[in-house]
Swiss-Prot record:
One of its GO terms (cellular component) is cytoplasm. HAMAP family: EF_G_EF_2_B. It is found in: Cytoplasm. Residues 8-290 form the tr-type G domain. Catalyzes the GTP-dependent ribosomal translocation step during translation elongation. During this step, the ribosome changes from the pre-translocational (PRE) to the post-translocational (POST) state as the newly formed A-site-bound peptidyl-tRNA and P-site-bound deacylated tRNA move to the P and E sites, respectively. Catalyzes the coordinated movement of the two tRNA molecules, the mRNA and conformational changes in the ribosome. This is Elongation factor G. Belongs to the TRAFAC class translation factor GTPase superfamily. Classic translation factor GTPase family. EF-G/EF-2 subfamily. It comes from Vesicomyosocius okutanii subsp. Calyptogena okutanii (strain HA). Keywords: Cytoplasm, Elongation factor, GTP-binding, Nucleotide-binding, Protein biosynthesis. Pfam families: EFG_C, EFG_III, EFG_IV, GTP_EFTU, GTP_EFTU_D2. One of its GO terms (biological process) is ribosome disassembly.
Length: 700
């Protein structure tokens, strides 16, 4: 089969935003105008196409990133048919892992902002993630029909609060209830979408007199921004004091692809105004797979050579699995982005991350949760394979002969844990299967067993995250379970350097056990991790026992010394010891190292570390005092306060242990008018009285 759409007509775009900016509604309109849905789905009535899990439809939030393929020829049919692969990402901070995964495989993004709330707390988190992967983006200021809407104010906030460089490509005609349409600054015409056909058609008129001055001013700014793209455009602009429409588009595109500017658009997705122009902007200003740097990976040779993979059907096949989902009808779905080459159904691929061969049986292109079966995928495609057994998120799938590992994704450590137990014997087996599948889908969710109590412990990124996991066990896997109180994942660390030795000797008739080590145990900078150094001279401990010493140290680190929490950020140096020709073995050295570390750490002034959360609260000014008082009561430290259109924004660091049930408390002290976001910031030493209480409770 030949390629049906040339690569330069592909756009892989993520829709990213704050939780209530109207992101899913925007995506729904894109599907309507590109002809993929005939009935508009609305989030508020629970029928949105992209929100296909039951919990999403009930809670009105997007949890998983649904991927959809659609085609667009432009508002006036002015383009060749372009293939747009859209990924709708969740906006809630507990699901930032989903955002991170999808940004990794996209070429560009459309950032949706609320015209009233502007840059809200979650916008900053998502923006940072897009910066990390250097994703070019356009901005869409949505909800222009709402009270307090202001397009240019939001553009200013993007500059001051996100450090972006927004360039308005339109200005709004009216706002709030009188929002009618937009002025397209390139053509300098007013665009009004027809409400009769849900905005499928539009008419252009002259710019209203009262907006001509503002339009001229913004036009000049846009032209100057375009002229800065390269010397050729700058010379033209300086000579003629203007640029042609073609040159403006060229300059804006060049700078947007380099992430130097963010072309900005506005509208109301709910009122069917403006989304069509955003689709045009994706085609005009966002990159195709050919416009972004070739992805690089490490080849499967002993030198681990770095090799690029160009977006080209003739290159060897390489793809990245970025999401696993369990579908009630077909089982496991592995979403993957093809970077190079061609893959046909029935082909074998090599999973270079796991060192295993996989046969690709059926492949589907997803339209939200509807599946179109396909026979092949090519460079630039996003598709899903059915029934792959050993593939997990972040794995590389590649050609059997030309092996490559694309960079792995990094996932955050969970910060909150819950004990879950099945209600009946019948639920027990089902719960094991359910948790296994859910953990395969979501790398920020972990399952473990408490060795002492035998309880199953689930851990994740926040209360909502674990709520939804438990909810899914009931709905999708029919598992009833009891849930314990949330547990905080503490850590332990040392504050001073110690040197200590331990000799492990055991005689019990016949061959004995002998291991003897001297360890220097030192604290490291927070976040540095564990370092093991071998300074043995003259063979006082034979080399073959060193891995056992290292293992003994690491096993003891898992269990800490204060309250059984993992010990972090230490450097352990083996600098002396002794061995016995007959009685020494790996087990003896492992035990000696483990006991030496345990005793040494107790002398190194150990302390308990607690997870601190970066909390941002947006509250009406009337409740400011109560909100601040509540944060202080929770041992929080306020770091910044800022005036916002909707009131005041408070930024603080608060211990996670004090944040349980915060959403209900905040709702009651502000009568439901404040909202907040929270994400893990760092581990810091818990105050002595708090640490003593925790240690005493856990050591009972």
């Amino acid at each position: 089969m030949a390629r049906t759409t040339p690569l330069d007509r592909y756009r892989n775009v993520g829709i990213m935003a704050h939780i209530d900016a109207g992101k899913t509604t925007t995506t729904e309109r894109i599907l309507l105008y590109t002809g993929r849905t005939h009935r508009i789905g609305e989030v508020h009535d629970g029928s949105a196409t992209m929100d296909w899990m039951e919990q999403e439809q009930e809670r009105g939030i997007t949890i998983t990133s649904a991927a959809t393929t659609c085609f667009w020829k432009g508002m006036d049919g002015q383009f060749e048919d372009h293939r747009v692969n859209i990924i709708d990402t969740p906006g809630h901070v507990d699901f930032t892992i989903e955002v991170e995964r999808s940004l990794k495989v996209l070429d560009s993004a459309c950032a949706v902002f609320c015209a009233v709330g502007g840059v809200e707390p979650q916008s900053e988190t998502v923006w940072r993630q897009a910066n990390k992967y250097n994703v070019p983006r356009i901005g869409f200021v949505n909800k222009m029909d709402r009270s307090g809407a202001d397009f240019l104010r939001v553009c200013k906030q993007i500059k001051t609060r996100l450090g972006g460089n927004p360039v308005p490509m339109q200005i709004a005609i009216g706002a709030e209830e009188s929002f009618e349409g937009v002025i397209d600054l390139i053509s300098m015409k007013a665009i009004f979408w027809n409400e009769v056909d849900q905005g499928a058609t539009y008419e252009t008129r002259d710019i209203p007199i009262e907006l001509q001055g503002l339009a001229k001013e913004q036009y000049e700014f846009m032209v100057e921004s375009a002229a800065e793209a390269n010397d050729e455009l700058m010379e033209k602009y300086l000579e003629e004091s203007k640029l042609s429409n073609h040159d403006i588009k060229k300059g804006i595109r060049l700078r947007a692809i380099k992430s130097e500017i963010i072309p900005m658009f506005c509208g109301s997705a709910f009122k069917n105004k403006g989304v069509q122009a955003v689709l045009d902007a994706m085609i005009m200003y966002m990159p195709s797979p050919l416009d972004v740097d070739a992805i690089t990976g490490i080849s499967d040779d002993k030198d681990e050579t770095v090799v690029p993979r160009k977006a080209d059907d003739n290159e060897p096949f390489a793809a990245l699995a970025f999401k696993i989902a369990t579908d009630p009808f077909v089982g496991n779905l592995t979403f993957f982005r093809v970077y190079s080459g061609v893959l046909e159904a029935g082909d074998f691929v090599y999973n270079s991350s796991k060192g295993k061969k996989e046969r690709i049986g059926r492949m589907v292109q997803m339209h939200s949760n509807e599946r179109d079966e396909i026979k092949e995928v090519r460079a630039g495609d996003i598709a899903a394979a059915i029934g792959l057994k050993d593939v997990t998120t972040g794995d590389t799938l590649c050609d059997m002969k030309e092996k490559i590992i694309l960079e792995r994704m990094e996932f955050p450590e969970p910060v909150i844990a819950l004990a879950v137990e099945p209600k009946t014997k019948a639920d027990q087996e089902k719960m094991g299967i359910a948790l296994g599948k859910l953990a395969a889908e979501d790398p920020s969710f972990r399952v473990s067993t408490d060795e002492e109590s035998g309880q199953t412990i689930i851990a994740g990124m926040g209360e909502l995250h674990l709520d939804i996991i438990v909810d899914r066990m009931v709905r999708e896997f029919d598992v009833e379970c009891n849930v314990g109180a949330p547990q905080v994942s503490y850590r332990e660390a040392i504050t001073t350097m110690v040197e200590h030795q331990h000799k492990f000797v055991k005689q019990s008739g016949g061959r004995g056990q002998y291991g003897h080590v001297y360890l220097r145990i030192e604290p490291q900078e927070p976040g540095t991790g564990y370092e093991f150094v071998d300074e043995i001279k003259g063979g006082v401990i034979p080399k073959e026992y060193m891995p056992a010493v290292n293992k003994g140290v690491q096993e003891q680190m898992e269990n800490g010394v204060l309250a059984g929490f993992p010990l972090v950020d230490i450097k352990v140096t083996v600098y002396d010891g002794s061995y016995h020709d007959v009685d020494s073995n790996e087990i003896a050295f492992k035990i000696a190292a483990s006991k030496c570390l345990s005793e040494g750490v107790k002398m190194a002034n150990p302390q308990l570390l607690e997870p601190m959360m970066a909390v941002e609260v947006l509250t009406p000014e009337d409740y400011m005092g109560d909100v601040m008082g509540d944060i202080n009561r929770r041992r929080g430290i306020v770091s910044a306060m800022e005036d916002m259109p909707a009131g005041k924004q408070v930024k603080a660091e608060v211990p996670l242990a004090e944040m349980f049930g915060y959403s209900n408390d905040l709702r009651s002290i502000t009568q439901g008018r404040a909202n907040y976001s929270m994400e893990f910031a760092k581990y810091t030493a818990a105050p002595k009285n708090v640490a003593d209480e925790i240690i005493e409770k856990l050591n009972k």
